[in-house]
Amino acid sequence: LIVSSPKPIRRRLGGAILILLATAGIAPAAAADLRAPSAGADWYTGAPAQTVDDSWAIAVDGSTSVTSNSSAFGSITVTAPVAGSPTQSGPRVRVEAIAGTYSYPGQAVASRVTGYQEEGSVMAGYEWVWRDAALAGFIGFNARSNQLSIVDPGNPVVGTGVGLRVAANFYANPTDRTMVSAYGSYSTKFNAYYSRVRLGYMVADGVYIGPEALFLGDDFFRQYRIGAHLSGVKFGPVQMSLAAGFVQDRVQGSGYYSSIEARANF
């Protein structure tokens, strides 16, 4: 199993992105009296920045996701500009860590198997920031470890190795009250992939609600999730996102999922 995801951003006086999903982002800079993109689109939570703020240098995103199909994952992502302001187009670096556990009925061993996954990645990329949209792309390497409670000949996703990893995130405000965000990543290690698309309508100042769809998998499992999200809820300097919905897994069958994501800028 893999949970990594994705981040978007919008601003009252403008729109932007930082990414997660990430669980990555993009962010632009502009005068406070102009309609410009915000300082750090959160591709992970979809939470929008309300004002232009160039004082922060890095964005930290955290997420946790659980399913009724016996899986639980958490991740933390740090994104920072290589030079210049994070609210302007420019090169970026991203470091991500993921850990989780899962269990499934082992067909080849006639017993329930529990798996443990740890993963870390380092990537470099570039982020383009426009008035009401942002796009970022990254490339780098990831190290991933998957261990099983018992040997399962039917599961090829086991062991530790390094792979090439690419990721991209997009965020836009098509209108003053709508948002769209997308995140995707792929690693050559176990052919792991993750993608998420969110649409949102602003129901309060900077708060969006709408549908989301996720597709994720690797050489062993394939899964999709359809649900709804509430993004942009703020608690002081922290922006939050909540989501829940239906999950369909090739190995585990159908079930439900929920996720909580947060972002803070430093």
Please name every model-derived segment.
Residues 45-57, 81-92, 129-136, 173-179, ...:
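Short loop/turn motifs that connect adjacent beta-strands in outer-membrane beta-barrel proteins
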Residues 1-55, 266:
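Cleavable N-terminal export/targeting peptides
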Residues 32-69, 77-83, 116, 141-142, ...:
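Outer-membrane beta-barrel proteins and related beta-barrel translocases across Gram-negative bacteria
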Residues 32-36, 75-76, 228-233, 253-266:
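Outer-membrane beta-barrel "beta-signal"
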Residues 57, 71-75, 117-121, 161-165, ...:
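Transmembrane beta-barrel architecture of outer-membrane proteins
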Residues 247-251:
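Short, exposed beta-strand-loop hairpins at the edges of beta-sheets
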Residues 89-192, 213-215, 244-246, 259, ...:
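Outer-membrane pore/translocation modules
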Residues 192-227, 234:
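Intrinsically disordered, low-complexity segments enriched in Gly and acidic/Ser/Thr residues
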